[in-house]
């Protein structure tokens, strides 16, 4: 067993040869945060009495869902063969929506621990992050976690991992994050296998931002990895992508609580506080340099995160609109990938059109708005960005079905995605059938082992963002895992389907869909609304239309009042007169009457799953 470091290296005065920067790559639920907890305990940076499960996941949603959303960086001392080392563990998100954050975290490291559940084997998203790590030429340490589980099959999955990375099955370490078995051997392996950082200590300072977090009291806390030179407190620094300059008010390392230091030298990982109040000022992937002696070239690899999925968010109570605006402004401080603009809908009132990285991002933002700011929201069906070329060659970018141009259209381009699906061999047929139905093109298939297959498809992004994942899980009994990334676009035969209530268009229900699926969408939506809209005193037609052509129709039957109840016997002409009068009244009502769509109908009709219908039922 390696003892705890007796005199740990001091930040800003640490020789790069004793620094080890590494991250943990793992799928959701494979035990990454639990293993991180054991490392914090083994290295003694967290006292046993302060320990709590998932120590590094600070957000409530992170702890409840058991996922990591924001990256964290922790400095831990560890001693091997009498030499004291400083280990910097950078905790990365495991979900596909946060791939850009993962790639920046990987760029800050020299090595990665590939953590795989010994009872489940490798998943699609872990594979995607593993390929990212290999692109960054990181030293990979394969590790099987949860070996204490009764269902664990370490020998089988060790062989699978070994064939993937190209090592021997004996080289795959076996640990248990729960009991702590093998954690110390893993820390020793980190020191021995991962190289120390390379960098020029005398060059002008260059540091890469791999995360920034908004703190209510101190403004934005920026996490950086220093590549060249050094950063000291009270000096002026410059962000290379925006050219803005700031004074460093505080500089330090997380261990795992923030500890101010006298600076950060080449190869070290720590945090900076400049008093900035907005995360957009310190962008993930940007390069920080000294203002007086700036570096000539940035570190490269920086890109603005692009929203892939758009959805309208509207408060159920219209008076909550200012609260929603403030709430989005606050979330934006901590989430540079969030974009939004105000939008009005005839049916739903005032709200925002919000851009997200993916469906999980959408769900998390919505949940945080509802939970942290106590808002009740309706979100419209998610859609992607289309490029529409009209006949006069004008190109229109459409993020909302209501922006889809009328009249003659030359072509519509839709974004595509490369999807990787890992699935047990017996479900290949079901998965291929689903992807074919979603207009996907098969790109390739590889057997990872005798039982598990990796299938690659090129598939329209619009098909993935709606309910693809739910259907994939139900067809494979929950065994499939999916990873996707945006990959070009293609020309497609897309049309806008409008829903008309008594001849009037309801903008919230419009959808852009493939011509082959338009009829199915129309029938589904008209059928749903027929059940949800209350009956009127007159017949109400619900129609689905493409342009001026009606493709589906349902009628809501009229409620009929019995006007003859007061006639006991008597002449037939008296009864006829009353019936004619009722008929006239209904005709007049139909001309002037407006159908109000109740709020519950919107919630139920716009939810792709049963959740909205349940919510409506509660009301």
Swiss-Prot record:
Source taxon at top rank: Bacteria
Any one cellular-component term (Gene Ontology): plasma membrane
Endpoints of the signal sequence: none
SUPFAM superfamilies: EF-G C-terminal domain-like, P-loop containing nucleoside triphosphate hydrolases, Translation proteins
A UniProt-annotated Pfam family: GTP_EFTU
EC number from the UniProt entry: 3.6.5.n1
Subcellular location per the Swiss-Prot or TrEMBL entry: Cell membrane
Residue ranges of domain tr-type G in the record: 17-198
Top-tier EC class: hydrolase
UniProt membrane topology term: Peripheral membrane protein
GO terms, molecular function: GTP binding; GTPase activity; ribosome binding; translation elongation factor activity
Name the record gives this protein: Elongation factor 4
Biological source species: Micrococcus luteus (strain ATCC 4698 / DSM 20030 / JCM 1464 / CCM 169 / CCUG 5858 / IAM 1056 / NBRC 3333 / NCIMB 9278 / NCTC 2665 / VKM Ac-2230)
